[in-house]
Each structure stands twice: as C-alpha cells, then as structure tokens.
Amino acid sequence: VEFSVAEEALSTATQEIREGWMQCGLACLAQEGTAATLTTAITDVKEDIIATRQEIVEDKGRANVVMCTPAFYSQVLLAAGKDFTPVMNDRIASTGNVGQWLGMTFVEANGAQGSIKYYDSTGAQKTVDMSTVQYVMYYHEALSVISNFEVARVIDSERFAGSLAQVEMNTGYKVTNTALARVRKVAGG
C-alpha cells in the first residue's frame, strides 16, 4: 500500500477512534449519571430541559453540556429556532452539530444508539443500552476521562509489502459527581 493510501486509512481510523471515544464518554454518563425524574414522552423540549436542569441545581450543582441523540437534537433545533447559536470553529462549522441554547452547549451525539461498551474507572467493561436515552445533561467537570496510552502511526506491514495504519487508545471514564449528571430516558422506548 502506498504511503498516501496508508495516510488516508490513518485519517479514517483516527476518525473512528474519535467517534468511539465520544460514544464511550456518553455511555459512562448514561451508566453512572443520576436518572432524571421525568420518564414520559417529551412534548415540550424547552420545559423538559429546564426541569432536568432544575434537578441538578437543586442538588447544589450546575449544568452546561447536553449530549443529545440525533432525534432529540432535531427537536432542540425546532424548539430553539433563532435562539439556537451554532458554535463556530472549523470542525463544528462543517458538521453543525454543536450549539448554545439556554446557557448550555448542546452536542448531537450521532453514536447515541443501541448498546455501547466502555471501560469504567476500575477497568471493568460495561455495556450500556442507549435505546431509551434522549439526552444526558451534565457539568463538564463531572466526567473524568483518563487516557494512559495513545498511538497513531503508519508503519511497514509485517504481513504484506506496504504500509499499515495503526491507531490504538486505552481510556477510562468516570462520573466523579453523579449529582452533576442527569440521564433523561423515556420509559418503554
């Protein structure tokens, strides 16, 4: 494989790792965060978000990030209308999946579906069912992410003539204060 092809494969692998890293963080928040009181279908997006935020504030916390499923993020965009402010930087401008509303950063988590596996702070692998999760609201310092090994490289392959793209990462996740993270689920899917 030519170096340019391996470089492209490395870029793709890095993107996949980035997506997996986000999925694992979201799974940790969903697993270790506190369940929001409301579990009924969401009919008023703004009211629902404010109610969940109120739960965190009443627990002496604050919230500034909302990780949303794509379906809920669409509801946020419709509800917020012109009040939704996209976050501007090169990566965000190309995806359009992060913005500000109600004093919080909303992130569209494309991988927030099905079952997600992650390693918790003890090194145990957990599987989290995301089928009923609509969003996770939290304070950005409530999620600890610690990586103890990262490598991304293009190397000569020992299996064939050419180059091989390799990306590896070992990361642990922990919600350090469950009062600062609320998981909004809808009962029964």
Could you tell me what each predicted segment is?
Residues 1-34, 57-61, 65-67, 106, ...:
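Long, contiguous amphipathic alpha-helices that act as assembly "spine/axial" helices in icosahedral shell
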Residues 25, 50, 138-139:
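Short amphipathic alpha-helical segments, especially helix-boundary/capping motifs
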Residues 30-100:
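Extended, solvent-exposed, turn-rich assembly/linker loops in the middle of proteins
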Residues 82-189:
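Sequence/fold signature of self-assembling virion shell proteins
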